[in-house]
Amino acid sequence: SVIEGNDSKFHMFYTAQNNYNPKYHRNGRPLQYVAHAISEDLIHWEKLPELTFGADESIYEPFDWRDPFVFYNEEEECFDMLLAARLQGASEKNGGCVGLCRSYDLIHWKAMQPFYNPKSYMTHECPDLFKMGDKWYLIYSTFSEKFVTHYRMADKISGPWTAPIEDTFDARAFYAAKTAQAKDVRMAFAWVPTKRGDSDFGQYEWGGNLIAHEIKQDKDGKLKVKPSNGLTNIFEKEITANNIEDIEIKNNEGEKVYVIEGMKETCLIEATIEFCEGSRAFGIGLKQDKDFANGYYLRFEPFYNRIVADMWPRRISGVNQWYVDGDKPFMVELERPFDYKALEENKVNIKVFVEGSIICLYVNDTVALTMR
């Protein structure tokens, strides 16, 4: 986190952790600290190790004290620092909170009671705070219930904070989001995690490639996401499939496909899909084999009010025919709620951005689902 102080210098606050020096461990676990550096030009930085500080252990645990976010609190006329923290003596599963420290000079910091403490998660990583319109928004990411970035909203910076029914921007493949605003556009920047061994069947790794969603505010204050105009405008050469015919499936049973060949490694796919009442599922398949069986799927499921990402095969073949992970009807945590009944017509407008192994779907410029 970087902020300009009253001394006309830029102050950077960042996490310090030493995994190898026992001096900075306790009971075999590394301690975490907030470190401080200053600059006059945002290029050359001077570290101030004497200002490094850890958690106030009368309130917080010393092992989770990271991701500082510093801002000027106009209501309190001071600088506040939000942190990913855990309450002292709390349960492992639900002890996480958004910690708070306060300063009047960016040098001396006092630990305060948590800024936000719902007693729901192991920790609240990468806290972020901003105001849009007349609402305040708190952003944080969790990995105990599931890997996802949440948001909360309030009328005042001091809360109370409320959770909308749909409180996320994306799914598993959009983590640790932080936001920034230029003019009237606010973006949420996160990572699409890589997979171990660059394999579909590998576990997600910690870190990956940058991805960004533009944040929009509804009239009721809830947040939606869309692709940025800058990203969409990159794709200048339009290739329209010729002789597209209506595709009809009677009795809502069976499968029928329309094939568009020649998909590029980097491309944007745009389409409007109209579906009938009672449709069980429809969608788009990417990077399919000649039998239209193996590949990746973005599937709309009106009956379940969701959009999911799937792939086939779902696992490396096993000894028995039924070793196909049929009990996982889509890729774990790659599911987005979607209210089909709220559509004025039974139509969805989709944009699918593809770059190498990354696929990002936007629906009606309100919902995003990213996969690798």
What do these predicted ranges mean?
Residues 1-67, 72-126, 131-171, 192-245, ...:
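Beta-rich carbohydrate-recognition and catalytic domains
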Residues 70, 176-178:
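Short, surface-exposed beta-strand/loop micro-motifs that present aromatic residues
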Residues 156, 163, 172, 181-189, ...:
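Beta-rich accessory regions
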